[in-house]
Regions:
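Pre-Walker A-like glycine/lysine-rich segment at the N-terminus of P-loop NTPase domains
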Residues: 1-33
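Conserved ABC ATPase signature
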Residues: 12-21, 289-324, 331, 337-341
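Post-Walker A helix-loop "phosphate-sensing" segment adjacent to the P-loop in P-loop NTPases
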Residues: 33-46, 327-328, 356-357
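Flexible phosphate/Mg2+-sensing switch loops adjacent to catalytic phosphate-binding sites
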Residues: 37-61, 375
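Electropositive, glycine-dotted interaction segments
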Residues: 84-272
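Extended helical coiled-coil dimerization/tether regions that scaffold
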Residues: 235-307, 424-433
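Short alpha-helix of the ABC ATPase nucleotide-binding domain corresponding to the H-loop/switch region
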Residues: 342-347
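C-terminal lobe/lid and adjacent interdomain/linker elements of RecA-like ASCE P-loop ATPase modules
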Residues: 348-433
Length: 433
């Protein structure tokens, strides 16, 4: 049962464990795709994205199915929403939206059935529940022939919310646009997508590899670079404008002061781990209407470009804004949270986020150290098996989840590998003696 004013503390942190290749990064990647489908109208029309999807989506089925339940508070009501999405290849070989559905109910109701807000099959609107007849007609008309490559929420944002907000600004209105009130559930879906923040470990973020291959296809020999590839790369780069990178941060001039404040806070954060850090300087170069910003670490007797910091410090630089979003109330997914981070630092961060974070954090890891922190909280540990099934940890008397996991006593995670299994693999066996 969900209360009228649910308190997420005690339920706001989750670690996903599993053997190598079990699909942990696949879960986080799916959330990244979900976010982009919900918020970016041009996502599926990006050729780089299409190549990436073709490489990562299940080869046997050729489909990606995502279902997500989320709670949303609107005025005095708490609403449970369920969103379903199926991506599949169309006749042209591109991934498109085969099926999309949003349904809702009062979160506090035990008996109420889910009400379908919209249902779309192969781009055709089967159901659309909007009480205002004019808005209903406009939505049908303005999304016609677009819903196979763009989601309802991203189109609603592009076709209705942006124009309505601009009109309100022109007329100096301070009330919510009518389109937001009349299409509130679609707006809540878009807002949910905006609250998702996903950090993929570099080895699992394949877009750069795909982009380089795509560029090579068009730049080899006498072929000219396809302009659509260039536009797609630029659009993909802008997606990360709010994320702090080690180098070449692209910052619009009107957002530069906010970027300075973020870097100042980043320096405070890093000083916890490196007490001799005096500050971080921004080396900026002008490029039309943006600044290209590198970070220079300032120590008492020398300066060093952030690129030459340790991998652990570089990881903390990248993670900073994601952790900040979780503290402020965002929903954050981090792949391989433990990579390049000391176990002591990781556990301290998790304790802080669980206690003071207003949002939610879900992360994948191989490090069993955090289990002793996580086991104190509800529904905080999931195990992913070799056959991709999820087994939630349930308390078993005084048993420690970390000990059971190490000993291969968690279902689907046998860890039945012994040192003798490596004999001969590296080119040395009994015959070579």
């Amino acid at each position: 049962t969900i209360s009228k004013d649910p308190d997420m503390h005690g339920y706001n942190i989750k670690g996903i464990y599993g053997m190598n290749g079990s699909g942990k990064s696949g879960i986080v990647t799916s959330v990244k795709i979900l976010k982009n489908i919900l918020t970016d109208p041009g996502y599926l029309n990006n050729p780089i994205i299409q190549k990436n999807l073709d490489s990562i989506i299940n080869k046997k089925t050729g489909k990606l199915f995502i279902e997500s339940d989320f709670l949303a508070k609107y005025i005095d009501a708490t609403v449970m929403c369920r969103y379903k999405l199926i991506l599949s290849k169309n006749v042209t070989g591109k991934y498109s939206i085969e099926y999309e559905q949003l349904s809702t109910k009062k979160a506090t109701s035990k008996s109420q059935n889910m009400k379908i807000i919209f249902e779309i099959v192969n781009g055709s609107i089967e159901t659309l529940n909007i009480e205002d007849d004019k808005l209903l007609k406009d939505v049908i008309e303005k999304t016609r022939n677009l819903l196979t490559m763009e989601s309802m929420s991203s189109l609603f944002y592009e076709k209705f919310l942006i124009p309505a907000v601009k009109e309100n600004i022109i007329q100096n209105k301070k009330t919510m646009p009518n389109e937001m009130e009349k299409g509130i559930y679609i707006w809540l879906l878009f807002f949910f997508g905006g609250e998702l923040h996903v950090f993929l470990d570099q080895s699992d973020d394949h877009r750069e590899y795909v982009a380089i291959n795509s560029l090579n296809e068009y730049s080899n020999g006498e072929k000219k670079l396809n302009p659509s590839i260039v536009r797609s790369l630029m659009r993909d780069k802008r997606e990360y404008v709010d994320v702090v990178s080690v180098d070449q941060n692209i910052v619009s001039k009107h957002e530069y002061k906010d970027f300075e404040k973020t870097i100042s806070k980043l320096a405070e954060f890093l000083r916890i781990f490196k007490a001799d850090l005096k500050g971080i300087e921004i080396d900026k170069k002008e490029n039309h209407d943006v600044w290209i910003c590198d970070l220079v670490m300032n120590y008492e007797t020398y300066n060093i470009h952030a690129e030459y910091e340790s991998t652990g410090i570089k990881k903390l630089i990248q993670l900073f804004v994601y952790l900040r979003e979780m503290v402020k109330g965002g929903i954050v997914f981090i792949d391989e949270f433990d990579s390049n981070l000391h176990d002591v630092y990781l556990c301290a961060l998790l304790e802080y986020l669980a206690e003071y974070g207003e949002g939610q954090l879900c992360f994948t890891t191989h490090n069993v150290g955090p289990m002793d922190i996580l086991k104190q909280y509800n529904k905080s540990i999931d195990f992913l098996s070799e056959d991709h099934k999820i087994y939630p940890w349930t308390k078993r008397g005084n048993y420690s989840p970390s000990k059971l996991y190490r000993n291969g006593m968690i279902e689907g995670n046998p860890f039945n590998i012994d040192s003798i299994d490596f004999i001969g693999v590296f080119g040395f066996d009994e015959e070579d003696e």
